[in-house]
Amino acid sequence: MNEQLKEKFAQYFGRKPEYVFSAPGRTELSGNHTDHQHGCVMAAAVNRETLAAVALNAGTVVNLYSEGYSLISVDIADLTVHPEEVNSTASLIRGVASKFQEYGLRGFDAYVTSNVLSGSGLSSSAAFEVLLGTIFNHILSAGKSAIEIAQIGQYAENVYFGKPCGLMDQMASSVGNIIAIDFADPAKPIVTPMAFDFATSGYRLCVIDSGAGHEDLTDEYAAITRELKAVCRLFGKEFLRDVAEEAFFDRIAEVRKACGDRAVLRAIHVFEENKRVALQRKAIEENDFDTFLHYVRESGSSSWRQLQNVIPSGWKEHQEVAFALALAEKLLGGRGAVRVHGGGFAGTIQAFVPEDMVEAFCAGVDKALGEGSCQIMSIRKEGGILVEVCA
C-alpha cells in the first residue's frame, strides 16, 4: 500500500515523496459521551488508517490532495480562524498548524488516502487531525508527545472546524492500542495502557454500518453538551465530573424543572457510565471478559434510553441506528454484546461477537444492510506514526 501511495504522490505532484505517515481510526470501548464532561473512557486504535505521502515545499502553503476530493491549498502564514472554513478540511489544517507556529512553520505537499471512512464511527476526523499533527511534529522537530498531538487535534476541531467534541477520539488515535483515559484534568489527562490481548478473548470486534450519515447532525451532538452544561450551571460547575452525584439527586426535582427531563436523563447516564468504565477497566485487568461484556450491554441500554443518542429528534421513518442495534441483538441471540459507540445518531454500532458466530453474524448483517456493512476489526498497537523515510 505504501508503494502505491508513493507512486500516486509522484504522479500527482511530479516529484517523489520524502515521508509516509499514518494515523489509525479508533473505537470507543467504554464511556459513551463522558469525555466532554471530564469523565473516564476506554478506547482502542483499530486496523483502519489514514495515510499520507509527504514532501516539504519551499513556501508556507500546505497542498493536500485526498483521494476522491479536490486539492486543498492553505497558506499557514495566516493562522486566524476563517469563518468561511467552518466544517472544512482547510480549517483543520490551519487549526493544527496554529499550535506549531513557534517552531517555524513549513509548507508541504501531501497525498492522502484512507480506509477510515467518513461516518464510519471510527472517527475519520480524529485520524486526520492526528495525521496532521504527526506530520507537523516530525517535519518541524517539535517533540510533541502523543497526548499533546491529541490535544492539538481537539483544539483544531473545536476552534477552527467549529464542532464541539471531547478528547477521546484524538487520544485513542494518537496513543494507539487499548487505553483507559481519565479526563478529570483534560490539560493533563491520565492515560493508562491496558495490557490485554483482545485476540485471546474468544470474541471478535465488529463494527456495523447502519447506513445513516452524520450530515446535519451537529445540532444533535451540541444539544448533549448544551443540556449537560445547563445542569452543571445549577451547581455552579462547568462539567458534570465536578458535580456531586448525591447533590444532583437531592435537587433532582429542581433540576427537572429548570433543565427538562432529557437533560436529567443524560446527566444520569454520564454519572452511571463513569462508574461502568471503572468496572470494565477492572474486569479487563482481571481478564474477566464476561463481566466486561455485561457492562457493554448496560452501556448500550443507557445510551439508548437515557443519553438518547440513537434516534435523532423527530426522525420517524429513518431510524437506522436503532434498526442496526435490534438486528445485531437478534442475530446474537443473547450472546455477546452490542452498543452504540462514539457520537451516535448515525454511522456505526459496535458488536462483540463470539468467534463461532462471526461468519453467520456478518452474513446476516450484510443481508439486511448491504454487502460490506459488517466489518471485523482488530486492535492496532501503534498510534500516529512516521511509517517510512523515503529513499
Where are these regions (language model features)?
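C-terminal nucleotide
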Residues: 1-26, 51-86, 180-339, 351-391
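Gly/Ser-rich oxyanion-binding loop with an adjacent helix/lid
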Residues: 1-20, 24-40, 73-78, 85-200, ...
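Structural signature of FAD isoalloxazine-binding scaffolds in flavoprotein oxidoreductases
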Residues: 40-58, 175
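Short, conserved glycine- and acidic-residue-centered signature motifs
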Residues: 45, 89, 317
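Active-site pocket scaffolds in enzymes
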Residues: 346-347
